[in-house]
A protein has these predicted regions:
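Short sequence motifs at beta-strands and strand-loop junctions characteristic
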Residues: 19, 76, 104-107, 168-177, ...
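A beta-strand signature from Gram-negative outer-membrane beta-barrel systems
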Residues: 58-100
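Periplasmic-side early beta-strands and strand-to-turn transitions of outer-membrane beta-barrels
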Residues: 93, 102, 118-216
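Hydrophobic, lipid-facing positions within transmembrane beta-strands of outer-membrane proteins
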Residues: 23, 82, 95, 109-113, ...
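Short acidic/polar hinge/loop motifs at secondary-structure boundaries
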Residues: 7, 34, 42-69
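Extracytoplasmic beta-strand/coil segments of soluble accessory domains associated
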Residues: 2-43
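Transmembrane beta-barrel domains of outer membrane proteins
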Residues: 28, 67, 87, 114-118, ...
Length: 228
């Protein structure tokens, strides 16, 4: 969804790397907590990294509503910069299936499926699921500081030569996220046009790479999280 958002006037997006990298959304100069993200009117502050806008596939949304300045009352009053509301597909056909899969560089896999059915008695159910995976083992150009181990076991830090720029390959930077949204309810009833009960589950796995200018080196560090 992030690629679709940046085409809107006043919208800017900054990412710090490959798939699963940190993202900062700017709306007319406002960013961070001043711009609120919603999915079908539900705030996503505690939904976890799997529901970051740069991880959600574009098939997931029917449309994207962007409010600048004046924000509708249902989104609260603390969004000084504005609101981005992702409205998901609400299929009304008897049966539907939408699926996609893509493969890219650095062992990047992205997949999405949206499946559901509406019965004649008004009972309806729907399942949305998507996942993103990438090794993020691309090359970068930067100067590298070599450490020297002395005979006594101590480490010598030689002067940094910033003219010695090398092409190095990133490692320990794998990212993987999964999300499942299930809904069940009724439609077209005298007492309700649409009444749904849903659940959401997501998880992410993010490896942390040692920085190219880092003096204290750590290995195989990662972050992971789950939401339900």
């Amino acid at each position: 969804l992030s690629e679709a958002l940046v085409k809107l006037p006043g919208m800017k997006l900054r990412e710090s790397g490959g798939v699963g990298s940190d993202m900062q959304l700017m709306l007319d100069g406002f960013s961070g907590k001043h711009v609120k993200i919603f999915i079908d009117g539900v705030p996503q502050e505690g939904a976890g990294g799997a529901f970051s806008l740069n991880n959600i596939p574009v098939n997931f949304a029917d449309r994207i509503e962007v409010y600048k300045g004046v924000v509708p009352v249902e989104f609260g009053s603390d969004a000084l910069g504005g609101v981005v509301n992702v409205v998901t597909n609400k299929h009304r056909r008897a049966w539907f299936l939408d699926a996609s899969y893509s493969y890219g560089s650095f062992h990047t896999h992205k997949s999405y499926v949206n499946w559901g059915q509406t019965l004649k008695n008004g009972l309806t159910y729907e399942l949305n699921a998507f996942q993103n995976y990438s090794d993020n083992d691309y090359h970068i150009h930067n100067w590298v500081r070599e450490f020297e181990l002395r005979d006594d076991g101590s480490i010598r830090f030689p002067p940094i030569d910033k003219t010695d720029v090398r092409r190095v390959k990133r490692f320990n930077d794998t990212y993987h996220n999964e999300a499942v949204i299930g809904k069940i309810g009724v439609v077209d009833k005298p007492w309700a046009d649409r009444l749904m009960l849903g659940f959401t589950y997501s998880r992410f796995y993010k490896e942390i790479q040692t920085g190219v200018r880092q003096e204290i080196v750590y290995g195989d560090k990662l972050r992971r999280g789950y939401t339900i």
